[in-house]
């Protein structure tokens, strides 16, 4: 079954924060046993944090853009340094300079299964609102909070296909403790002057298959 976010109140006008409408569609899809949450082409959906849930395919049609909000208050905050992970020994983020996991998240999932992000649309992290000091050659990356584009914890049977991921202010695809992962045919296009906008970071994951994907980013493709 298809759950079109426009039918759940999303505007797709590039201005309105559509997070609540998108989340409503995701919740309805998961609660009904699963299906496809659709973002139609020709629309820009501005959004704060969204939570992907079990048995949901999050599908962006060609020409659809999910773009991070300009306002930090639209992103849900996690407690820095608080144990949040399930069934993972020591995630890499525990050793990061910011002393814990990312405090803010854009596209997030935790303790879920059968999650997919698909389609030829685009997810844009709106990097410019997170810039530190900008010089001729470099943009300071040692400032927080910054928002990773995709942050997925303890997700089993995870698929990411075809989508373009761009404008990430921090790690683009951070997978923590995920199992049975397929990443295929995606494009990652980030600012080569912005520090720490890694491409794909499998962190304590198992059975990951990554292929036929392109990444242009400043660090750790």
Name what the model sees in each region:
Residues 68-101, 124-149, 185-199:
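Acidic/polar low-complexity surface segments
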Residues 58-61, 116-119, 158-161, 181-184, ...:
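All-beta strand scaffolds that present successive hydrophobic residues in beta-strands
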Residues 26-29, 46-53, 171-177:
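Short, T/G/N/S-enriched strand-turn elements that build extracellular solenoid repeat scaffolds
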Residues 9, 34-83, 93-103, 122-123, ...:
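N-terminal extracellular ligand-recognition/capping segment immediately after the signal peptide
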Residues 39, 52, 60, 68, ...:
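Extracellular beta-strand solenoids
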Residues 5-39:
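Acidic Gly/Asp/Thr-rich repetitive segments characteristic of extracellular carbohydrate-active
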Residues 27-30, 104-107, 124-174:
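Right-handed parallel beta-helix
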Residues 211-216:
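Conserved small/polar residues in nucleotide/adenosyl-binding loops
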């Amino acid at each position: 079954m298809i759950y079109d976010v426009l039918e759940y109140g999303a505007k797709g006008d590039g201005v309105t924060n559509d997070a609540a409408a998108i989340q409503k569609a995701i919740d309805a899809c998961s609660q009904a046993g699963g299906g496809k949450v659709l973002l139609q082409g020709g629309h820009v959906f501005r959004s704060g944090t969204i939570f992907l849930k079990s048995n949901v395919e999050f599908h962006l049609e060609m020409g659809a853009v999910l773009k991070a909000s300009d306002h930090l208050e639209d992103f849900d905050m996690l407690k820095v340094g608080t144990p949040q992970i399930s069934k993972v020994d020591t995630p890499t983020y525990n050793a990061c300079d910011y002393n814990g996991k990312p405090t803010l998240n854009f596209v997030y999932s935790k303790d879920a299964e059968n999650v997919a992000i698909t389609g030829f649309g685009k997810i844009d992290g709106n990097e410019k609102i997170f810039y530190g000091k900008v010089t001729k050659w470099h943009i300071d990356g040692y400032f927080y909070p910054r928002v990773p584009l995709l942050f997925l914890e303890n997700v089993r049977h995870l698929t990411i296909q075809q989508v373009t991921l761009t404008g990430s202010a921090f790690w683009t695809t951070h997978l923590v403790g995920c199992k049975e992962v397929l990443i295929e045919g995606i494009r990652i296009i980030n600012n080569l002057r912005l520090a720490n906008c890694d491409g794909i970071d499998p962190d304590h994951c198992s059975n990951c298959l990554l292929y036929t994907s392109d990444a242009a980013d400043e660090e750790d493709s």
